Amino acid sequence: MGPLLGMVGAGAAGSAIGEGLGMLRDKWNRDFQERMSNTQYQRARKDMEAAGINPLAQFGSGQASSPSGGVSGSSFGSNITSMLGSSANMLMQLSKLKEDAERANFGSKTVQTINDARNNMVRSVITLSKRVK
């Protein structure tokens, strides 16, 4: 059960990382929108000067448009959680296959093959959970 708990912890860590990245992206977005809003008249003046129009003659006629920021969508944590959930599911299925094979007294080669597959899966999950940290 150790690797399984590790996967659950890694999934939670992935969700927390994804949430943190989403919050950071949202802050950058708000800062961008504020910068654009705060400089809209200055940008309009530069545009008018570049077009050869006297900005004072156009005073009060409008400002440069302020682009809207992007919409945040955090999928990093949910992708890791989904991947680790699939790995946990596969690990439990391999464990069940091993138990079934032992109960049915299959040949030792079949049990060994299932054990090898399970051990490889455990190593992969441990490696993946270390990368997430």
UniProtKB/Swiss-Prot annotation:
Localization (cell): Virion
Species annotation: Spiroplasma virus 4 (SpV4)
Biological function: Probably triggers with protein G the injection of the phage DNA into the host upon conformational changes induced by virus-host receptor interaction.
Keywords carried by this UniProt record: Capsid protein, Host-virus interaction, Viral genome ejection through host cell envelope, Viral penetration into host cytoplasm, Virion, Virus entry into host cell
Primary localisation category: virion
Keyword Lipid metabolism: no
GO cellular component terms listed in the entry, alphabetical order: viral capsid
Any one Gene Ontology BP term: symbiont entry into host cell
Keyword set includes Translocase: no
Record-given protein name: Minor spike protein H
Family affiliation: Belongs to the microviridae H protein family.
Lineage: Viruses, Monodnaviria, Sangervirae, Phixviricota, Malgrandaviricetes
